[in-house]
Amino acid sequence: MKKLFILLFCFLPLTIFAQNQLNGYVYEANEEQKENPLPGANLVWLNTTVGTSTEFDGSFSLPLSKTSNQLVISYVGFKTDTIKVNSSKTIKHWLEPTTSLDEVVLDSKVKSTSRSYIQSENIQYVSSDELLKAACCNLSESFETNPSIDVNFSDAVTGTKQIKMLGLSSPYILIATENIPSVRGASQAYGLSFIPGTWVESIQITKGAGSVVNGYESISGQINAELQKPFTDDKLFVNAYAASNERLELNTHFNTKVSKNISTGVYLHGNTHQEEHDRNDDGFLDMPKFNQINVMNRWQYTNTQKGIVTFLNLKYLDDYKQSGQIDFDPDTDKLTTNNWGSEIDTKRYEISGKFGYVNSDLPWQSLGIQMALSNHQQDSYFGLNEYNIEHTSVYSNVIYNSIISDTRHKIKTGVNFTYDNYDEFALNTNYDRVERSFGGFFEYSFDNLKKFNLTAGLRFDTHNLLGEFITPRFHLRYSPWSKSAFRASFGRGKRSANIFTENQNLFASSRQFSILNNNGPIYGLDPEIAWNYGVSYLQGFNLFGRKADVTFDFYRTDFKNQVVVDLENAQAVSFYNLQGSSYANSFQVEVNYEAFNNFDLRTAYKYYDVKTDYQTGKLSKPLTPKHRFFANAEYKTELKNQSQWKFDATFNWLGEQRFSSTIDNPIQYQLNKFTPTVATLNMQVTKVFSSKFEVYLGGENITNVKQDNPIVSANAPFGTAFDTNFVYGPIFGSMYYTGLRYKLN
C-alpha cells in the first residue's frame, strides 16, 4: 500500500487547467531548409514582458498574448524577426544570419559550444561543429576539445580511453543516447568507443546530479548524445580516415525519404588497426590490434499535424581487440605462460525506440515513451585472467509533460522500469545476478525567464537488491543582472558497483583480487550512495569590443558509501565498503573570448581534491592530477563561394599525479610517489572546398611526449610485480592523420 501511495502521488498533477499556448521551433536558415535548431533563441510578444527561449532542439512553448499578436524572435548573430501570429497552430521559423552578401558570406556565429543564461541546470551544449575540431572517431574521443571532461588511457595494453567528470570516473556519470542510458553495466569499460563520432549530432553535458526523469544512478553528471536524424541528415555522407599509426576508418550514412512522414537511414562504421608498434622497446604492443564493425538502421516518423514523432533504432556491433607482447600468438599462447597476451571479443545487439506525442488541442501537454532492449556479450582474457560477461538489459520510461496555469509552471511525471540480467565469469567463479527496478518520478519547474527559475524533482524506486529509496534533485538559477546566471544544485545518487567490468584494466596485471565480503546484495558489497552539491556562475561581457564569457564552477561529491578499489598493495587489489569518508571537490574557471573576427579562444583551469579513506589512511585518488590547464584556439577564414579554411589547436597541461604505492615490489620495480607533469598539443587544419566536400589533416601529441616504461615488470609479465595500470601520459608519441568528408544533400 505504501508503494502504491507514493507512486500515485507522482501522478496527482496530471489533471490541470491551462491557458492557450503557442508551440513551435526556431531553426538556422539554410539553402536546404534543414531543421538545424537554434537553442537559446529568445521569443517575446511585442510591447510585453511575456516570453520564453528555445530548448536544445529549437522547440518552445509560451502563452498566447491578449494584447499582442506580434512575436519577436531574436538570436545573437542573427537578424531579429517579428512575425504575426493569429492562431495557436505549431509554427516553424528560420532565422537569417546578420551578415549575408552575394559574394562573401560570414559564418553565422552559432557557437560550437554554448551555455544557457536561463536554464536552471548547468548544461553545456556541444554541436557537431565542435566534434569536427578533432578526429572524433568515437564518443570517447569527442571530448578532447572540452575542458569539462578529462580523457585518459586506463592502461598500457587495451588502449581504452576513460573519461572523468568532477574528478570521478565514468561509472558515476549517466551516459545516454537520446536520453536512453546506453553506457552502463557490461558496456561501461568500452561502451564509449562503440558510438561512432559521425553518428552524433550534438552532445549535452550536465554537471551535477541531473534530472530525476533519467533515473537514480547519476552522481557526478550526465552526458547525452543526440544522434543524426534521417529527416535532416545528408542523403549520403562519407568520412574516410587514415593515421600514421596505420589505423584506418570508414563511415558512411545513407538516408532516404520513404514517404511524406517516414525517413530511414543506414549508418555504417568500420575501423581496423593490424600493425605492430613497439616504440619504447619493452616487448609489448604500444596499441592493440583491432577490428570493429558497427551498423545502425534508424527510422523516423514525423507528423506535425498530429503532433507525433517516433524513432526506431536497430544496432549491431562486432568489436575485437588483441594486445600484449609482440611475439604473442593467440592460437598457441592463449592462457599460457608462453607469451603474455589478451583478446577481447565483444558482440552487441540493440533495439531502441522513442515515441512522442503533443496534444494538438492542448499543446502544452505531451507524452513520451522510451524503450530499449540490448544484449551485450564479451569473451576475454588478460594473460592468465579469464573474464566473460553477458548482459541482457531492458529499459522503459514513460514521461508526461504539462503545465499548471501557465508556462511558468511546468511539470514532468512518469514511471520507468529497468531489468538487468548478468551472467559473469571472473576469477574462475560465476557471479550471476538479476536486477529489477520500478520507479515513479515527479519534477516541477518554475520559469521566470528574466531573473529566476528552479527545478525540483523527486523519485521513488523499488529495487529487488537495493530495496526502496527516494531520490531528490534540485536546481535553481538566478540572474542578478544582464548576461549573468548564478546556479546552485544538489542531489542524491545510488548505484550498483559492477566491480569487475568497471575495473577490467586490473586484470592486465598480476595483482591478487580480494573482496572483503560485508554480506551486501552485490558481490557481498553494499550499493554506492553519494550526494552532489554545486554552484556555478556564468557572466557574459565585452572585452575590447568583443564578446566574451567566464564561468566559475565548484562541485563537491560526498559518498555515504563507496565501493573502494584499493591498490595500495602493489601486488593486490581489494574491494570493500567505505570505512570513513570519501569526497571529490572540483573547481573550474573557463573563459571564452572572440579575440577578433572568426578567431575564438577558450581557456580553462581546473583543480581537483579527491580523497578516500583507505585501510592505510586517507589518500588522494591515484592518477588524478590536482591541477590542469586547458586552451583551445579556433580560426576560420571568411566563407567565400562555399570555400574556407579552418584551423584548430588544443593544449593540455596536467600537473603531477599520485602513483598508488609500489613499495611492496622488488626495488627495480618501485616507482616514484608522483608522476612528472605532462603537456600535449593537438592541431588540425580543414579545407572546405564546398558544402559537399572537405579534407582535413591533423596531429595528436605533436610535441611527441612519451611516458617512459608504462608497464611495470614488462620483462617478467608472469611475475608478481607485473602491472599495466600506471599510465599517466601518451605511450605512442606523436600521431598524424588525414581524412575527407563528402556530403550529398
Please place each PLM-identified region on the residue numbering.
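Short, acidic, small-residue-rich periplasmic hinge/interaction motif at the N-terminus
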Residues: 27-34, 39-46, 74-78, 86-132, ...
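Short acidic/polar hinge/loop motifs at secondary-structure boundaries
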Residues: 60-63, 162, 180-207, 295
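N-terminal periplasmic accessory domains that precede
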Residues: 88-94, 139-142, 161-164, 176, ...
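Extracytoplasmic beta-strand/coil segments of soluble accessory domains associated
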Residues: 140-181
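Flexible loop and strand-edge segments within Gram-negative outer membrane beta-barrel domains
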Residues: 273-294, 300-367, 373-391
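Membrane-embedded beta-barrel scaffold of Gram-negative outer-membrane proteins
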Residues: 366-380, 479, 487, 524-577, ...
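C-terminal beta-signal and adjacent terminal beta-strands/loops
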Residues: 494, 560, 653-662, 686-745
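Gram-negative outer-membrane beta-barrel transporters
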Residues: 554-558, 577-660
